[in-house]
């Protein structure tokens, strides 16, 4: 796809612009708006909970909860400071596109009661699909990647520590660690469990939500 033609920062900005718009709608409770995303969208879901970026955007409204399906977690934040809103990651044990291990380590490192993870056994990227497993020879595998994120929100290239502030630099930065070729496909058990979890998570976090920083 064309996912490397836009930066994560730009997508998070868009997410908060959408939140601002929704929060002004007379039929919507601004304190009961959640964000969820899949794969790269899951990364946006996580980054939208990072306090430095929330503060930099000068946000007056926040997401009530964050539910990320198989997000990229291969980021080492200089400032591990995240929202107190409920944050949950759903990811497959065998994911070779956005690996589960960095997500598990992220949750353990953050060590906050509102941040949790569910890892589905024998499941790959796209476990909530109905299709069979298939190999995508063009997909980026980030299993050997770990990018530093400084306090300004810049994602830095491996080794060079150059901020990937535009799509071109981001594409160059990926070349230092990514490999081509990933597996994607559904797992019926994981799909059913994740759908039920998502429904329960949204019901719980939105029915009980209150303004959280």
Q: What residue ranges belong to the model's regions?
A:
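Cap/lid segment of the alpha/beta-hydrolase catalytic domain
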Residues: 1-10, 48-53, 136, 173-180
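Primarily recognizes the serine-hydrolase "nucleophile elbow" in alpha/beta-hydrolase
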Residues: 6-84, 94-97, 101
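Charged catalytic carboxylate motif
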Residues: 14, 102, 193, 197
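Hydrophobic pocket-lining residues that define ligand/cofactor binding sites across diverse proteins
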Residues: 22, 26, 110, 202
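Hydrophobic anchor at the start of a short beta-strand
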Residues: 33, 87, 114-117
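Short beta-strand/loop motif that positions the catalytic acidic residue
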Residues: 89-91
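Conserved loop-alpha-helix segment in the C-terminal half of the alpha/beta-hydrolase fold
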Residues: 103-112
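C-terminal catalytic histidine-bearing segment of alpha/beta-hydrolase fold enzymes
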Residues: 114-213
């Amino acid at each position: 796809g064309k996912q490397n033609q836009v930066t994560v920062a730009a997508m998070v900005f868009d997410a908060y612009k959408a939140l601002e718009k929704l929060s002004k709608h007379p039929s919507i409770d601004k304190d009961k708006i959640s964000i969820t995303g899949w794969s790269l969208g899951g990364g946006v879901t996580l980054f939208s909970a990072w306090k430095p970026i929330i503060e930099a955007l000068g946000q007056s409204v926040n997401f009530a909860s964050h539910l990320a399906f198989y997000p990229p977690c291969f980021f080492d934040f200089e400032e591990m400071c995240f929202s107190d809103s409920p944050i949950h990651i759903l990811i497959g044990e065998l994911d070779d596109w956005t690996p589960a291990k960095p997500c598990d380590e992220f949750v353990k490192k953050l060590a906050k009661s509102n941040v949790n993870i569910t890892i589905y056994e024998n499941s790959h990227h796209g476990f909530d699909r109905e299709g069979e497993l298939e190999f995508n020879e063009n997909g980026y595998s980030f299993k050997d990647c770990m990018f530093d994120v400084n306090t300004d929100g810049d994602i830095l290239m491996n080794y060079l520590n150059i901020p990937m502030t535009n799509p071109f630099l981001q594409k160059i930065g990926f070349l230092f660690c990514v490999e081509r070729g990933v597996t994607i496909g559904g797992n019926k058990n994981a799909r059913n469990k994740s759908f039920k979890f998502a429904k329960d998570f949204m019901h719980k976090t939105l029915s009980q939500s209150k303004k959280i920083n």
